[in-house]
Structure formats: structure tokens, C-alpha cells
Amino acid sequence: FCAFAQSFSMSPETEKALHDLDVAIENKKEYQERLSERIDSIKNVLDKCRKDEYVDNCKQLFNLAFHYSGRASLNALQNILNTPEAKQDTDLRVGAQLHMASVYSVMGLYGVVIRMLRNIEEKDISDVNKQIYYHTIYNNHVRLATYESNILSRADDGTDSVRLALLDSLIAYQTDPVSKAAYKGEKALLQGEPDKAIAIMTPSLGKSTGLIKLRIGYAMAQAEMQSGNVDKWIYYLAKTSEQDIVEARTDYKSMPELVQALYSIGEIDRAYAYLVCMLEDANIFPSRLLEMEVAHHFPLINTKYEVNEAYKRRMDSM
């Protein structure tokens, strides 16, 4: 776990990325309160708005709450499904069901997601919803594989034929070139071609925003890790973690891996601080993978942190 500690030298660029993340964490409560206020403002008008505005308000509520509060996201989607419009509009109904499956997947209800997706008839899935459909299947498959590899203490061999087939479907139905580049990059990663993945994704990273920027940033981190560039691995994990904090997402994807990376180079204080950051938010969404990662890392890093603190106190008293 500390294999890189003796030989690693951090670049100024990566040190700045970590500093920016530290600053973002200091302001985390402000970011979350700001988003929570926006969510509450929409909740407060739901019962008073015109009928023709209700579904749009619920959609806006979902878009704000998704990746911040799973419970609020599910409530918004259920409100949509309860409307007469959802009973008449197949696209609206199926879209809400697919987004609901996405939320359940983050929560860790992988079996529920599989059943929900099987219950949606293929003829009811429009081309627009097919992007969401394959995206949900793919993410659920990856999360389930990650969960199983943690439980069974075995590594994912990266040659998952199902995952590759799902990526092909995502690439085929994706109309946005930036999103398509993200999935092509992930495919190259799965095929063990990190340099190809970096070449595909780098031009799109600067053009991306929101969730797709997070996706590309995390994939870039994986590519750098595969290439053996520890400094760049940490850099991209720090940048995507900062984006999560600033945009008030609490289902952290990069930060658990960043904690592991920092521990591996002997950055115990930062690893501990980021672990505490995740602990504070572990029940907001909630996310099963995040809870598992925190539970996995906390005992080891907490013990090392306490040993370091005890050593510092002894040195200060001399």
C-alpha cells in the first residue's frame, strides 16, 4: 500500500491540484447549503405551481438532487410517475424509470436495477432513452463488478466482454462527440491501451462540463495509473474530487481512490482529511460503494494517522 512512498516526487501542478481540493473542502458546507436551498425552493412551489409546470419543476428538482441526495432524487422521479402525463407519455414514463434505476444503482441496489430494466419493454425505449438505458446498464454492471471484487478480495481482470459490448452500444447510440470520446477512451482502457485512451480523451476534456467532465477526468486518472504515472494519477483524481465538492456531489467516485493513492506515497495527513470529508457525507446520498470504501480504508489510515500524531506530540515536547 505504501510502495511509492520512498521514490515519489510530486510535481507543482499536482501539489496545486491538491491545494485547490483542500480549499474546496474548507468551503464544502457552503456549496452544499447553496444547493440544498435551491432544492428546497423548488420543493416549496411544487404544490402551488400550475399543472403544466409541475413535471418540469420535478425534472429540475431531480437534476439538482441527482448525485447529491438519492432520496430527494427518487421522490422527484416518483412525483413524475404519479402524474397523468406519465401515464399518457411513454417517453416521459420510461425516462423517469431509467433515471430511478440509475439512482438505485448508486445506492447499491444492483439487483433491483436489473429487475427494473428487465420490466421495461424494448419497444417503449426511444433512441434518446436508449442512451440512458445503456448508460444505466453499463454503470450498474461496473458497480456490481467493483462491489464483488471488494467482497471477494479479487481484482477485476479488465477483460469483461459484457462491459465491452455495453460500451459498444453506448458509443453507437451516443450523438454528443465529447461523450462518445469518453466511452471510446474507457473502451481503450479496458483493452489495456492507456496511451490510446489518453490520446482519445485529452482533446475532449477541455470541452466537457458536468458529469461527462467527471467521467473523462476519472478515466484519465485510470489511464495514467495504467501507464505507471503516479503523479498524473493523483492529479486527475484531485481535479475530479474538487469538481465533486464544488458541485456538491456526495457520491464521491474519485476521492476513495485518491485516499488510497495518497496513503501509498506517505501523505497520511491529507489521506486522513479526505477520508473524514467522505465520512461526513456518507449517509447523504447514500452510496453503498462509498460506504464500503470508507469502511475499508478508515481503520488502516486512522491507525497510521494516530501514530503520526503521537510522534509529532513527542517531538514537540522534547
Task: Spell out what each predicted region is.
Residues C2-R313:
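A "functional boundary" signal
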